[in-house]
């Protein structure tokens, strides 16, 4: 009961509403409220207060999350490690959506013929790392920088170049660009590099696909990774590479709990990713 309440509070701190928290935990909104109420009663502290359509955490709740959040995820992970991965145990690979769209279609279709007992889910990199730490995901396939002190086994598959997409020809580096969400910890490094070149992030999207489509529609040029060019089949006349941005790349990693690397099924999945992604990353843009 106590662990359920803590897990619910941790999810609520990210999702901000009872309904979204319930969706993440596959429980009803009333069950979320009941779990939080029981936790408040157990601890003798008020943990949440209404804030319009959202829920705001109290200072006591923030302190509780800061002190036990990492430990709770690690406990989940240790319990997860006790599970034996049989040939038919369902494996979950949590991935960056752009990496799935850009690189994994054909590779994963072939791999599923050999091992049908696994699924793909998509998340942002910080959440992927959390899910692997807690055992909710067996494997993470991440774009962008990983958070510090994650404690996971990682494999660096490559560094994906960025391209500027524009409807009209570009003869010089734009002063404004549509970017992805730079508040995402996996992407914050991009902000410093753009600032160095005097480029202002005019709009920040939650999707590289949305950024590219706006650019192709004539809104503003957009900064997108090479996989988006391939996925959307963007014509070469709309793709522009600038020497000033040559060092701007996004690292691609696999992450997992070290103990899971002993599984031959996990090793086979890692090999499939390792064989496919570097070729795509290093391939010339369209």
Curated annotation (Swiss-Prot):
Disulfide bonds: none annotated. The keyword Iron-sulfur does not apply. Keywords: DNA-binding, Transcription, Transcription regulation. InterPro entries: LysR_subst-bd, Tscrpt_reg_HTH_LysR, WH-like_DNA-bd_sf, WH_DNA-bd_sf. Residues 1-58 form the HTH lysR-type domain. CDD domains: PBP2_LTTR_substrate. The keyword Zinc does not apply. Residues 18-37 bind DNA. Belongs to the LysR transcriptional regulatory family. This is Uncharacterized HTH-type transcriptional regulator VC_2383. It comes from Vibrio cholerae serotype O1 (strain ATCC 39315 / El Tor Inaba N16961).
């Amino acid at each position: 009961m106590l662990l359920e309440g803590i897990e619910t509070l941790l999810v609520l701190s990210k999702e901000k509403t009872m309904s979204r928290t319930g969706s993440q935990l596959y429980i009803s909104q009333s069950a979320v409220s009941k779990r939080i109420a029981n936790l408040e009663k157990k601890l003798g502290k008020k943990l949440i207060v209404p804030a319009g359509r959202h829920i705001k955490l109290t200072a006591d709740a923030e302190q509780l999350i800061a002190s036990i959040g990492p430990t709770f995820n690690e406990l989940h992970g240790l319990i997860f490690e006790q599970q034996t991965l049989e040939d038919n145990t369902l494996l979950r690979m949590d991935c960056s959506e752009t990496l799935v769209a850009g690189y994994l279609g054909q590779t994963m279709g072939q791999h599923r013929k050999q091992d049908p007992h696994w699924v793909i889910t998509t998340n942002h990199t910080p959440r992927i790392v959390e899910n692997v730490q807690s055992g909710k995901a067996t494997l993470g396939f991440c774009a962008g920088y990983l958070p510090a002190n994650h404690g996971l086994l990682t494999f660096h598959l490559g560094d994906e170049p960025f391209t500027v997409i524009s409807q009209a020809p570009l003869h010089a580096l734009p002063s404004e660009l549509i970017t992805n969400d730079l508040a995402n910890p996996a992407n914050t490094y991009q902000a410093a590099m753009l600032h160095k070149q005097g480029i202002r992030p005019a709009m920040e999207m939650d999707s590289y696909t949305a950024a590219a489509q706006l650019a192709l529609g004539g809104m503003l040029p957009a900064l997108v990774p090479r996989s988006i060019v391939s996925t959307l089949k963007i014509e070469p006349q709309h793709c522009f590479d600038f020497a000033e941005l040559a060092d701007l790349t996004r690292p691609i990693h696999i992450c997992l709990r070290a103990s899971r690397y002993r599984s031959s099924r996990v090793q086979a999945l890692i090999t499939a990713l390792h064989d496919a992604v570097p070729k795509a990353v290093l391939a010339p843009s369209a």
